[in-house]
Amino acid sequence: MKRGSLIGLLLAVALAALAALLPGGEAEPPVIGPAQVVDGDTLGVAGQRIRLHGVDAPEANQLCERGGQPWRCGADATEALRGLLAGRPVACTPVDRDRFGRIVARCAVEGQDLGAWLVGQGLAVAYTDYSWRYVPAEFWARWHGRGLWGGSFQTPAEHRRAQR
């Protein structure tokens, strides 16, 4: 490939990446209020169903292995999130909507990013199909054998595919 063509191609790719980062219109307002935990990565807040952005927690019925024994990792992720929230108000910043119409958002309780907390505890994986934001937290959890990383498991995406 000629140098000019390569530079043009790189410029086009860079511009496309930049365009993907620009907002596509009016941003949705924040969603704030008490949260009901639906599962390890889904909340109900102010009458809205919210999927946490950039994380993928085990499915509610998913089993993992820890210490050679089955572990209800999906149920534990849900309960741990419920315990963290403990009725405190959640503030969610919408990022997108998913194919089911749910708001996809970054949410926090008292300044604690829920996605970072879940991934750092090893209760969810960084969902790199959508964001690399939580990869450092996943690396930390892996390094320290936290949660999922203390045994063996199918990623939630693999588990969903296997259930079809």
What are these regions (language model features)?
Residues M1-R164:
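Small beta-barrel nucleic-acid-binding modules, primarily SNase/OB-fold domains
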